[in-house]
Amino acid sequence: MAKKIIGFIKLQIPAGKANPSPPVGPALGQRGLNIMEFCKAFNAQTQGMEPGLPVPVVITAFADKSFTFVMKTPPATVLIKKAAKVDKGSSKPHTDKVGSITRAQAEEIAKTKMPDLTAADLDAAVRTIAGSARSMGITVEGV
């Protein structure tokens, strides 16, 4: 028989830097989950990633105080800002441009994000990434 699910917890945690302090500790503590067990498992799974890169994670909490978690790909905005070498997007995205990325960079980001996107093929995923970049004030050359 399947375990009874008591809830889902969605967090964004920097890769390799999960610790019991907020937001991780309170979110897991109120469901009665073992915080250190999650932190060790999360840090072990993200040790191959770039340290500090925010990783969305969905934790499934069960009634017997056990849990499982699924890691998603880093947010597209973070990957776009890294590719464009900017700290933040434009406050007026359609008038002030803060940087640009090439189509090749957009394709690389789309390949990374493909498991989490609803796009049917790579070209549709590239257009999705290009739209996100435009809404941040970053131009995409060749799209």
Swiss-Prot record:
GO biological process, one term: translation
SUPFAM superfamilies in UniProt: Ribosomal L11/L12e N-terminal domain, Ribosomal protein L11, C-terminal domain
Superkingdom, taxonomy of origin: Bacteria
UniProt entry tagged with the keyword RNA-binding: yes
Alphabetical keyword list: Methylation, Ribonucleoprotein, Ribosomal protein, RNA-binding, rRNA-binding
Pfam families, sorted: Ribosomal_L11 (PF00298), Ribosomal_L11_N (PF03946)
CDD domains the record matches: Ribosomal_L11 (cd00349)
UniProt GO MF annotations: large ribosomal subunit rRNA binding; structural constituent of ribosome
PTM annotation: One or more lysine residues are methylated.
GO CC entries: cytosolic large ribosomal subunit
Role description: Forms part of the ribosomal stalk which helps the ribosome interact with GTP-bound translation factors.
Subunit relationships: Part of the ribosomal stalk of the 50S ribosomal subunit. Interacts with L10 and the large rRNA to form the base of the stalk. L10 forms an elongated spine to which L12 dimers bind in a sequential fashion forming a multimeric L10(L12)X complex.
Family according to the record: Belongs to the universal ribosomal protein uL11 family.
Protein name: Large ribosomal subunit protein uL11
Gene source species: Burkholderia cenocepacia (strain HI2424)
